[in-house]
Amino acid sequence: IQAGAPHDICAYGTEAMHVLRAEKGFIIIGQDTDGTVAPEDANLGWAIGKKKPDFVGKRSLARPDLVAKERRQLVGLMTEDGKVKLEEGAQIVLDPDQPLPMKMVGHVTSSYHSATLGRSIAMALIEGGHEREGETVHVPMPDGVVRAKITSTAFYDPDGDRLKL
C-alpha cells in the first residue's frame, strides 16, 4: 500500500468490484443473465463472428424464439430518486395500477449505490428492453412503488474513453 500511495492506489473489496463493473455495464453470467439470455439480449452481439459462413451455435441463434422482439433483454435502470436503491430480484411492471395479479415484464438483476455517480444504479432483464430505452417502469417495493427510467447498461464512461488513456 505504501509503494502505491504516490499513485493513489488503495485497498478495495469485492463490493467495490461489483459496483465498478456495474457502472461500466459489465455483466456477471448467472446474475445478470440466465439460461434464456442470448448474446444479443445481453448486449454481447459484437462477440459473434457474423461474417463467418458458419460457427457452432449459428443455427440456434436464428431460432424464432431467440429473435422475438418481446424477449427479456438486459437494460440499465435509474430510479427517479437516486437515493432509492432497488432490491435485486424485484419484479418490474409497466402499469402499477393494473389489477392483481400484475403482469410482470422483468426483474432487477443487479442493484448498487454508485459513489462515482452519486446515486443508485441497477440492471434488469425486461421484455423488449432495448426498444424501451427512455421509458419509465415501476418496481413494487416494500415501501411502495418506485419509478425507474430504462437506460443503457453503461452508466459510467459509456464510450470507454477512460480505457483509452
Residue ranges and their predicted role:
Residues 1-165:
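Conserved, structured C-terminal
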